[in-house]
Amino acid sequence: AVGDGGLSHEETTAWVHQFQPDCFAGYNHGAPSGRLSLRERGCAGPLGGDNLTWVEDAGKNEKAYDGYLVAEFTYPLLPPHEGGADWFYSLPQHDSLVFPAEKIYKDYKEAVEYGNIFSLNIGPDYNGNIREIDCKVLREVGRMIKENK
């Protein structure tokens, strides 16, 4: 979402915690606050690690702020491409694009290693359905996880 409703991150965290004291609020850029380090388009790694997100100030803030209890990293299942959206459904010419199951499984294993939360963004198509290619890759990742416990 764009905008902050007129509150700083610290004020927003305090506002959220008045209703849900144990909530893991976090922000992907700007002043650090909350308990959750958000690494948008980032990667797995320890709290306070270097170069774990594309957001320059987020990495610096993670090192300087000791309130984080856990880190999440996230990226869209749709790999980089020309034109169209990344985080939501893109364009029909990108319907065959998806990160390979091997990459997602590797990132999953690293998230487990560091105790990170790993989130994938999967946007529906124009009909509101998850693309079949995404389902296929996610089923393969699930198989890899089950077979390598």
What are the residue ranges of the model-derived segments?
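Mature catalytic domains of secreted/periplasmic carbohydrate-active enzymes
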Residues: 1-149
